[in-house]
């Protein structure tokens, strides 16, 4: 009987079993060892190993032919650890922002062209904006999204805009030129503003959180029912967000050049 199985879930499960086996062995394994340990035909195991090798999940020693875990998995692990670190680091600073402004704070990153809320903090007042962890928001018309887009190449921003653009309110930017000009301002001043572009009457501010490499990996922001973006209240909130984002960046190893 053939072991051929076109079910993608089953294929992933088989690949995961092999990765677990190599990890637990704590040494490179041969094709024969892997096939015997998993109870699968060598041809099936070889196909899975070849696929995983092509994407860097496993590496094959040119001299011995044995397989070991690839660098790509280390990169994924580092990314996960980085996210865990920033969530721990940002918890108290976000609470402090909420206490000082009585508005909602959120930490986010870019996920397939949209803003993904990683963590949030909300005031105790009855009237506040809810920022749900795990929720996706448009990137081109939110303060946090514009901060994240501002660090991307123009071609990447254009693709995201063309894929996701729509008019959420009368204030939403519906042309790429308008967005591009706004992102230029974001880079120059070091923060982004949201002025009723996603939800009428809702305003926000966000600043970039840099990693040790100098890239903008996260955005930290406040969102609420600020009366005006030119008010003393909003200017004070902006200064707090920028200061807090800078402190988080430094905690992640970033240093201003």
Report residues per predicted region:
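N-terminal helix-turn-helix
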Residues: 1-88, 246-254
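Short, structured helix-loop boundary elements
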Residues: 8-12, 31, 66, 70, ...
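A structural microfeature
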Residues: 56, 117-119, 218
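A structural signal for short hydrophobic beta-strand segments in well-ordered beta-sheet cores
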Residues: 58-60, 107-108, 209
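Amphipathic alpha-helical effector-binding/dimerization core
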Residues: 63-163
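Intrinsically disordered, acidic Ser/Thr/Pro-rich low-complexity regulatory segments
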Residues: 111-145, 172-207
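Cysteine/selenocysteine-centered motifs that mediate thiol-based redox chemistry or coordinate metal-sulfur cofactors
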Residues: 159-167, 245-257
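Extended hydrophobic
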Residues: 175-247
């Amino acid at each position: 009987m053939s072991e051929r199985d076109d079910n993608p879930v089953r294929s992933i499960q088989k690949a995961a079993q092999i990765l677990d086996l190599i990890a637990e062995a704590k040494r490179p394994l041969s094709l024969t060892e892997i096939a015997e340990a998993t109870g699968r035909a060598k041809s099936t195991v070889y196909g899975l190993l070849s696929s995983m090798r092509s994407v860097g999940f496993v590496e094959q020693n040119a001299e011995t032919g044995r397989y070991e875990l690839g660098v790509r998995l280390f990169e994924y692990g580092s990314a996960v650890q980085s996210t865990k670190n920033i969530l721990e680091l940002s918890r108290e600073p976000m609470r402090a922002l909420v206490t000082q402004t009585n508005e909602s704070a959120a930490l986010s990153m870019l996920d397939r062209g949209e803003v993904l809320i990683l963590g949030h903090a909300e005031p105790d007042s009855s009237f506040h904006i809810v920022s749900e962890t795990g929720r996706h928001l448009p990137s081109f018309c939110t303060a946090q999204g514009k901060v994240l887009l501002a660090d991307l190449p123009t071609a990447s921003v254009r693709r995201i805009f063309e894929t996701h653009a729509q008019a959420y309110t009368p204030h939403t930017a519906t042309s790429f030129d308008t967005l591009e000009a706004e992102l230029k301002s974001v880079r120059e001043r070091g923060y982004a503003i949201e002025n009723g572009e996603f939800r009428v009457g809702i305003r926000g501010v966000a600043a970039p959180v840099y990693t040790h490499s100098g890239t903008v990996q996260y955005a930290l922001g406040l969102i609420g029912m600020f009366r005006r973006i030119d008010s003393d209240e909003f200017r004070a909130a902006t200064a707090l967000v920028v200061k807090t984002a800078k402190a988080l960046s430094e905690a992640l190893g970033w240093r201003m050049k």
